[in-house]
Amino acid sequence: MILSDKDIKKYLEERKLVIHPIDDPQKQIQPSSVDLRLGNSFLHFKVEGRAYIDPTKDNPQDLMEIIEIEEGKPFFLRPGEFVLGTTIETVKLPDDLVARVDGRSSLGRLGIIVHATAGYVDPGFCGQITLELSNINRVPVALYPGMRICQISFYKLTSPAETPYYKKAGSKYHNQKGPTASKLNIDFCVKEDK
């Protein structure tokens, strides 16, 4: 079951669901979702001179540089470019809700993709949402910090998760702040017995 605006407001009022800050509820709360806004930090891959990325050997965090954009200034996403962005809002899900992040239609019509694959948010997650931004247009597109960039919708589980994200061993992105690079390399770390 997808939550309606009425149910979203109820979850927010009862603090079961936290989205902070929501500066303009009239604009941000939609009939069955909440619009989230673009933060001012981006992670950009430093790929010059690299033939490929090997997640079993490379630490993606070492391959990225942070770009900070001043308020009111645009970030130009070039054709074919891929960067990580973040939402301004921090989202905290209760143990009985799953969330789905999707791009806004208006940006999709400009060729902006908001997430490559990771649109699913587990019950019990808390943190800012990392956005996997790319431009499939043939011209650069200006993105402004503070603009509504994506929408998050909420699905009620049949029962609360037995092991929500914050209790799950290996929850790599819990309490993330800002754009967060891939931690896939952790999956390949082998602990040796001594």
Swiss-Prot record:
Task: Report the EC code(s) recorded for this entry.
Answer: 3.5.4.30
Q: Which domain of life is it from?
A: Bacteria
Looking up InterPro entries in the UniProt record yields:
dCTP_deaminase, dUTPase-like_sf, dUTPase_trimeric
| Residues annotated as the enzyme's active site | E132 (proton donor/acceptor)
Enumerate the residues marked as the site Important for bifunctional activity: G119, Y120
Pathway participation: Pyrimidine metabolism; dUMP biosynthesis; dUMP from dCTP: step 1/1
Against Gene3D superfamilies, the record matches this protein to: 2.70.40.10
Q: Which family does it belong to?
A: Belongs to the dCTP deaminase family.
**Binding partners and assembly:** Homotrimer.
Q: Give the protein's recorded name.
A: dCTP deaminase, dUMP-forming
Which species?
Dictyoglomus turgidum (strain DSM 6724 / Z-1310)
Q: Which lineage do the record's taxonomy fields give for this organism?
A: Bacteria, Pseudomonadati, Dictyoglomota, Dictyoglomia, Dictyoglomales
**Gene of origin?**
dcd
